[in-house]
């Protein structure tokens, strides 16, 4: 097992020094979802939620979250992101309406963007919940996970189905 990199010689937390790492193009895709009622699905689809356009606001929240990840994840380095894309797709089955969220993040730097993608996916789902909770508080935020990543010393990763 490799040694922990986020502890100093005194056993206290530290931010890892990445100054010797080569800057490369790095990408990450993270996913999340939220299950809503038919009523919420209809209201989102017809832009009838009182707080505004749910998907537009959630998309912007996801982008903002990716940019601010280092403010809420203690050992995360601040990064200059090259791009963040938040997309949505509906999956419907037997009166269940699941909003699928996919976030793609890209940078050119010395560390990966997995945490930025995961944070953005989470914030996007949370924003949908916040905007729709006046209609129904029983929404369920689903699993949030890394789908794939490219670049860096550890190489590429693709989640197995």
From Swiss-Prot:
It comes from the Bacteria. It catalyses: (8S)-3',8-cyclo-7,8-dihydroguanosine 5'-triphosphate = cyclic pyranopterin phosphate + diphosphate. Pathway: Cofactor biosynthesis; molybdopterin biosynthesis. Its EC number is 4.6.1.17. GO terms for molecular function: cyclic pyranopterin monophosphate synthase activity. It holds the Pfam family MoaC. The active site is at 130. HAMAP family: MoaC_B. Homohexamer; trimer of dimers. This is Cyclic pyranopterin monophosphate synthase.
């Amino acid at each position: 097992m490799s040694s922990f990199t986020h502890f100093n010689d005194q056993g206290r937390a530290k931010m890892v020094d990445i100054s010797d790492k080569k800057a490369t193009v790095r990408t990450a895709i993270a996913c999340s979802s939220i299950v809503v009622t038919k009523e919420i699905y209809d209201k989102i689809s017809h832009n009838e939620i009182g707080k505004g356009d749910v998907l537009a606001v959630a998309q912007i929240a996801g982008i903002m979250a990716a940019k601010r990840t280092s403010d809420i994840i203690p050992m995360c380095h601040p990064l200059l992101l090259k791009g963040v894309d938040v997309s949505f797709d509906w999956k419907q089955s037997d009166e269940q309406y699941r909003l699928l969220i996919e976030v793609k993040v890209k940078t050119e730097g010395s560390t990966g963007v997995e945490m930025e993608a995961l944070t953005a996916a989470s914030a996007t789902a949370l924003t949908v919940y916040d905007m729709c909770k006046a209609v129904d508080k029983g929404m369920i935020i689903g699993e949030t996970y890394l789908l794939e990543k490219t670049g860096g010393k550890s190489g590429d990763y693709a989640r197995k189905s």
